[in-house]
């Protein structure tokens, strides 16, 4: 299809396949509704906004169907300034499944949630003008093979008004980041508890405005500034951490 908008207005599971040229999927449901979008071999390009625009819901799940390849891209200019990413959500967003997903964020971010962003599966490749993955309230990565190329931060959480939010937590999975600013940036707390992480960053590889912890996993970093920067406290309890180059 060309120039089409697919709007989801009720809770449920929706299986999507095929190509959409200069169109988008919009989720506009009740704030109590949960929506699952199964990407089953999808290619969506939108020149004037997000490829997937989750405007209202309680929670949204984007599931990558097994054995499928999926591609999402946006344009370099948006018709509305409210949205800011190729996949944009005003609610909690989870990406899971075992398929693959390519995200090209040509306007600002690759994936953005105003609430909690969870990645739990899939082979995900993100390129973005600014941040790769941005969950304002939090980012949690528990599984998946994730590659990020970012013009700003690779992974970021920025909530500052709630001390229990603004954190990034990596418990498992494979994460490769090439970032022009920080590799991973958290406002309150950054914890690496597991997984395999490799970061190339022009600024700090790992950065927390407050606290950080290394509790497990294998992390290798190369950075133009600090390897793991925490303003108040850094705890090292377990795991392998290799800083190949840093300032």
Locations of regions flagged by a protein language model:
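A composition-driven surface/loop motif
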Residues: 1-247
